[in-house]
Amino acid sequence: MNTMNHSLIVSTLSVVLFALATSLSVCAADENPESTADSALPSTPNVIMLMSDDQGWGDVGFNGNEVLQTPNLDGMAASGVRFERFYAAAPLCSPTRGSCLTGRYPFRYGILAAHTGGMRVGETTIPEMLKKKDYRTAFFGKWHVGWVKADEVSTRGFYSPPSHHGFDEYFATTSAVPTWNPTVTPQGWDSWGGEEGEPWKGGFPYVQNGVEAKENLDGDDSRVIMDRVIPFVEANKDQPFLATVWFHTPHEPVVAGEEYKKLYPKSGKARQNLYGCITAMDEQIGRLRAKLRELGIEKRTIVFFCSDNGPADGLAKKGVASTGGFHGHKHTMYDGGLLVPACAEWPGVIPPGTSTDARCSTVDYLPTIAGICLGDSAIKKSLPIDGVDLMPLMTGKVDMLDRDLFFGYRRLVQGIDGKAIISGDWKLLQEAKKGGKTRLYDLSKDPYEENDLSAASPERLSVLSQKLAEIEASCQRSRDGADYRY
């Protein structure tokens, strides 16, 4: 048996046992027909969207990693729903991030790779929708869908901060920072960003509501972020709020504090840093979950978690980071680049111990949150939305989703034009590299994409190729202005 599969079975059993041990009150409510989740559903629940950066499917306890310590994420999965097959809209950061906010494929809104654009104000985002119902909205962490400093000049991208897209408050960086001491280039780092020991990218990367932040920026970067999240939650405990928290962890430069590295004495240096910074992030997620319970608002707060794509190329190839056995990694159209760890928690609404292998995606966040907080009518009919409402799936009313999923990553100047479509159990992909081949896989029989059926199944190849072309053409019309008034 595949080692990760064996670990996954063990992890799943532990999740169920944890749920049974810790959720008796929720179960009792479920058994009482007069105390159903639907009848107790808040009309304006709080929404928290958590996202890690470059965390592989196999780099979390609830997906079977027996070494990496993520007790709070494991607790979330146990208390709510664990998504076994949750896909990022693209195999890298910026395109996926936009999909989380818009419910649309990256090829629709024109962010096709990292640092190649910025979020257009014509897009309708989750915070813009929720503000119409008097939600307070805030963003924390890595933005990466536009510059956050007005005077920042670059050959790629443009100024498009969170405040242009519905967020009342923000504490954000444009892109990556070291995961420990985020303002300083770490020891031994010899790539982009700066010289060892010098200021990271020449200065202070965080901007808070338009002003460069210069206080409380030392130590674990996830703690630096959460120190801004907690006051926002406390200040808005009596009114509905949206908190979008996008951690930098575990994106390179991957650095952990000594106390976190010591948790993994038998791991190599690279894995000590990777595991250490993920555990530090998990600790801050636990801090947030504890605060919700302290304030007594956990039952009117839904919390989502996912990664933005698979693990970084180098860390995956060296076996430091894990895709859980799935082929590929970040920057590839294989499932190792697209499948990410994901879960959601809403005590009293999402049954504890829920697990689904239905294929879900980051494009599903907007229609799900709109359905929960506003109703389906809140979505503009003139604006194509590619996601679906996941609440019926998360509450056990349906088992599967009948839809196709499209993924893309394009940087034509480098010959990169990666695309993929999943239709039913079949996946067609065009490799994201110059001269990349077209591949066809039956994921029901070949989840690790080892047996290319493009030559053996020409009819299936033709059908999926046509579907892919139709979706891409629709996205190009959106990207060229069909969805906006000029």
Residue spans of the language-model regions?
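Bacterial N-terminal signal peptides that target proteins for export
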Residues: 2-15
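Formylglycine-dependent sulfatase
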Residues: 17-432, 436-439, 443, 447-473, ...
